[in-house]
Amino acid sequence: MSFGGESGLRNVGLGGIHPLTQRYAFGGKMSEFPIYKGKPTAYLDQNVLDIFVKYGMSEFAVNLRDSFQVIYSDETLKEIKRSGDQADKFLDVLNNLNAFHLKHVLTRNFEPTDNVTITKRDAFEAYQEYCEQEPIYQQLQESLVQSNFKSFGGRKGDSFDQIAQEQNEVFSELMSTIREQARLLEKSHPELARVMDSYAEVAQVKMEVALKESTSLMKQNVKNELDWSGVKEFRSFVNIGPKELNNISAPNVLEKIWEQFKDKEPYCGLDWTLEDFFLIKKSLIYPDKPYFKYQKVTAIYNHLNFIGFHPDSKTYKERRFVAAMSDLGHASIASFAHALFSRDESFIIKTRAAYEYLGITTQVFLVNLENA
């Protein structure tokens, strides 16, 4: 394997810990952080960490540690938490790999950027911090994907209005938490407190508008919303699914997929492009904001699953849907690394397809375990 220069790492800095909320690094301008110039970085899918938990620091693990700067994300910590009493073993593995913690950088107005930081820290400390702050964020994340879960056939018996109400209530709770934190900072950091309070107010309004519009649109287009599966309905309507799509191979995977759909109803009657189809022309929630590549990876990966390109199985079941969302999260954040390693071939194929179209230079490797 060959990795030259700083390719793929132009937006990675060495970060510290923000005193208010340690889930994200703050700054926005990468000039505020020293630029990382160390070894090529490697992001490991959870199934690779599983190998090292089961078999210890094998020769492969040592080679990864010595050849790369291994990095992990909050998505990694989320999966570790789901492992229950195995958590300490995963954290030991991260420490043995000398892994750094990767975080997104937000602006001082709490808006996303195309930058990340990686921080050297003890994995147990990072995990404890994650678990302390995770409940409300986890509740929000789980709530926001419920519409998506319903489109994959989950939430049987629940209406779009019911799901939207749940989402709005959870988001309101988070905004209330931010306002409470702002009040605590009024004397010591008045400008930051003002920004936080303003952000919470604006974000709440935008979320309510987005939920109202999306719910109205769904109700217009779905006849039996209580027993609806968007995946089944869509694939049946266009008469395209895994059987047709899984024959497509690189290069130009997304272009080849769009060729299959563009002359089908309803697309033949629309002035749509590939980017419309894969929902990457602009952000659906914040259409006036920059739409970064790592965010587009999320949209592409999810849509590939939806239309049936090497899809995850049984995503109408909550456990399988949660696993698919974690895969999507790993694919997105790993786009900041030089290399991504995974044992899941379907994950590899979808991730490579997204990276190829977006011009992301991260090299994606399939790990095969002999005698497994």
Task: List PLM regions with ranges.
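Active-site-proximal, substrate-binding regions of enzyme catalytic domains
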Residues: 13-336, 346-372
